[in-house]
Amino acid sequence: MSDLGRGEGTGFDAERKMQFLYQLRQKGVMDKRVLTAMEHVDRGAFVRGHFASRAYEDVPLPISSGQTISQPSVVGLMTQALNVQPRDTVLEVGTGSGYQAAILSHLARRIYTIDRHRNLTREAEIIFTRMGLVNITVLTRDGSFGLPDQGPFDRILITAAAEDPPGPLLQQLKVGGVMVVPVGQSDTVQSLIKVTRLETGFDYDELMPVRFVPLVEGTARD
């Protein structure tokens, strides 16, 4: 079994949950369905080693392959902006730790999550199986091209920064669908953008400043 930090010794007990949800509300996460989903997903299961003791702090933390697990408030705000509906099919680009996909799995009918790092997708699959999350499909792919064979999607969430919303992914969004994506250079503060596909094109709404690792083409050699 992979040596994954599962949050043992920290405990996502009732008191921690109350504090965790309070800090999410303080940062603007108010959607009840999102809060309930985040209450049901123990972030400690996705944080490795000695960082597990900080799993419930509102900070990003390092994971494998030079990547990070985003701070909970950013995860909550991105999920809230995505406005996922129960019958939706969602594409997540950038599996990372798997935490975001696990939350989405409580909100949507089907989740496809892809990452260029095989070790990350493998570790995420182990955690999803352990949690009994059966509506998530995990694939090792070049995320910048999405999954055209599975689209179009009701919602697309990109958890890495692109210089512009990727064209192939925009084309995989249903009319009426929503994409949330960080846009900007990797070495500067980026903007979180909400894209809605209309009959006649796309509507863009700037939400807030963020910092994410860059969206990189190709698959990693790991």
Curated annotation (Swiss-Prot):
Keywords: Cytoplasm, Methyltransferase, S-adenosyl-L-methionine, Transferase. Its EC number is 2.1.1.77. It is found in: Cytoplasm. GO terms for cellular component: cytoplasm. Pfam families: PCMT (PF01135). It is an enzyme of class 2 (transferase). GO terms for biological process: methylation; protein modification process; protein repair. It catalyses: [protein]-L-isoaspartate + S-adenosyl-L-methionine = [protein]-L-isoaspartate alpha-methyl ester + S-adenosyl-L-homocysteine. GO terms for molecular function: protein-L-isoaspartate (D-aspartate) O-methyltransferase activity. InterPro entries: PCMT (IPR000682), SAM-dependent_MTases_sf (IPR029063). It comes from the Bacteria. The active site is at residue 70. Belongs to the methyltransferase superfamily. L-isoaspartyl/D-aspartyl protein methyltransferase family. Catalyzes the methyl esterification of L-isoaspartyl residues in peptides and proteins that result from spontaneous decomposition of normal L-aspartyl and L-asparaginyl residues. It plays a role in the repair and/or degradation of damaged proteins. NCBIfam families: pimt, PRK00312.1. This is Protein-L-isoaspartate O-methyltransferase. It comes from Jannaschia sp. (strain CCS1).
